[in-house]
């Protein structure tokens, strides 16, 4: 397959564009449409040996959640026995980092354009409960028209990853761009941490250097905690004020996206770009979990990728795991519950599962995705219960493609 230069009869593989820790990126062409893509080839063996399988799966799921003009698009995911292939939007202009390294700081008008696109993408991600956590010029790409695209969601987190205190606790990111509260180890708000990183990026755009620089990391972190930086004289007063409000070491008083959008520097001249939603499936989701607020709303209509992500038969686990017992059309056991598709009416499913927590999402008018979770008890006891009692009781309502 790969020896012929064509992947799955669908993508013609071209030259290598770059290498990463777990594989390489090729230029490729979709032979069905002629579209040029960047094909990220990930070695399963390297990923598994590094213990990074969950991170790769999370990156894939997150990228399909955040369809936005200023986010690199993930077109398709494929897998073989040894590799995972990610067909990504090909962004030909290279990294923002390289542009600054070659040409130095940018003018205020160009900086404003890049920054607006960055904030639009970040705000959209936050609206869907996604926090990037590694925003930096190396992860910002430029297309041929000079538009900015956010890339590399490998360290991203979802709102559901927060602990009971509502905060994230995993310290990650790039030292020069990470917020001081992330390093403190007491938990942090992912949205506020991303905005700090946006502040560092804005400073780099306008100054051509980092705001906090020191050969000693401890000294650099000390400067960050104090907010100890100064802007070069060519940075305008309005830009200085915005940078200062973004690089506020106190996350409680740090400017929010809503406040940022109203600042004079951000609003100057051109209209503020707002997140663009391409289709209903990409609409922002309220992550606050107020179940009582949507009792009259219809179930969410899922697109094909959401179906793949939710269905136990078609989830992302097979990218790195092989379970011979799992196949489309069978409900399969997991430590916390099970998922299956069914054509049974919702009332019929509820009647069979009234002793368990049940959640459904409409995939099509006649097809439901059912998520069954155990209320408590030991996971080891759940598996025999599932195999011997629950699965047989559900076998006539679990849908499979062959049943259509």
UniProtKB/Swiss-Prot annotation:
Residues 294-321 form the NAF domain. Keywords: ATP-binding, Kinase, Manganese, Nucleotide-binding, Serine/threonine-protein kinase, Transferase. It is an enzyme of class 2 (transferase). Residues 11-266 form the Protein kinase domain. One of its GO terms (molecular function) is protein serine kinase activity. CDD domains: CIPK_C. GO terms for biological process: signal transduction. Its cofactor is Mn(2+). SMART domains: S_TKc. The keyword Ribonucleoprotein does not apply. PANTHER family: CALCIUM/CALMODULIN-DEPENDENT PROTEIN KINASE KINASE-RELATED, CBL-INTERACTING SERINE_THREONINE-PROTEIN KINASE 6. The activation loop within the kinase domain is the target of phosphorylation/activation by upstream protein kinases. The PPI motif mediates the interaction with the ABI (abscisic acid-insensitive) phosphatases. CIPK serine-threonine protein kinases interact with CBL proteins. Binding of a CBL protein to the regulatory NAF domain of CIPK protein lead to the activation of the kinase in a calcium-dependent manner. This is Putative CBL-interacting protein kinase 27. It comes from Oryza sativa subsp. japonica. The lineage of its organism: Eukaryota, Viridiplantae, Streptophyta, Embryophyta, Tracheophyta. The gene is CIPK27.
């Amino acid at each position: 397959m790969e020896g012929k230069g064509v992947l799955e009869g669908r993508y013609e593989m071209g030259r290598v564009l770059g290498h990463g820790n777990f594989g390489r990126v090729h230029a490729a062409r979709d032979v069905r449409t002629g579209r040029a893509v960047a094909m990220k080839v990930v070695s399963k063996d390297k990923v598994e040996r590094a213990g990074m399988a969950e991170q790769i799966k999370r990156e894939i799921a997150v990228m399909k959640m955040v369809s936005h003009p200023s986010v690199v698009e993930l077109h398709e995911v494929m897998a073989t026995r040894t590799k995972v292939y990610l067909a990504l939007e090909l962004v030909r202009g290279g990294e923002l980092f390289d542009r600054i390294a070659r040409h130095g700081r940018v003018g205020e008008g160009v900086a404003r354009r890049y920054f607006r696109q960055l904030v639009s993408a970040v705000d959209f991600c936050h609206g869907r409960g996604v926090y990037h956590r590694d925003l930096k010029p190396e992860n910002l790409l430029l297309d041929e028209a000079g538009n900015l695209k956010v890339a590399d969601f490998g360290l991203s987190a979802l709102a559901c990853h927060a602990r009971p205190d509502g905060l994230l606790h995993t310290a990650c990111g790039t030292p020069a761009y990470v917020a001081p509260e992330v390093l403190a180890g007491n938990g942090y708000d992912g949205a506020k941490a991303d905005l700090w990183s946006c502040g560092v990026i804005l400073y780099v755009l306008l100054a051509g250097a980092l705001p906090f620089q020191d050969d000693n990391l401890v000294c650099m972190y000390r400067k960050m905690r104090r907010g100890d930086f100064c802007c070069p004289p060519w940075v305008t007063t309005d830009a200085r004020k915005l940078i200062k409000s973004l690089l506020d070491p106190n996350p409680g008083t740090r400017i929010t996206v809503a406040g940022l959008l109203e600042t004079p520097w951000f609003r100057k001249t051109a209209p503020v770009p707002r997140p663009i939603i391409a289709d209903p499936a990409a609409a922002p989701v309220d992550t606050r979990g107020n179940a009582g607020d949507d009792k009259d709303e219809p179930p969410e209509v899922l697109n094909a990728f959401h179906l793949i992500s939710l269905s136990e038969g078609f989830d992302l686990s097979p990218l790195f795991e092989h379970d011979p017992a799992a196949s489309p059309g069978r409900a399969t056991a997991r430590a916390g519950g099970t998922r299956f598709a069914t054509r049974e009416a919702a009332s019929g499913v509820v009647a069979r599962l009234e002793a368990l927590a049940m959640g459904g999402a409409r995939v099509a008018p006649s097809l439901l995705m059912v998520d069954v979770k155990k209320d408590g008890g030991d996971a080891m006891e759940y598996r025999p219960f599932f195999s011997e009692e629950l699965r047989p009781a559900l076998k006539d309502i679990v849908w499979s493609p062959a049943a259509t």
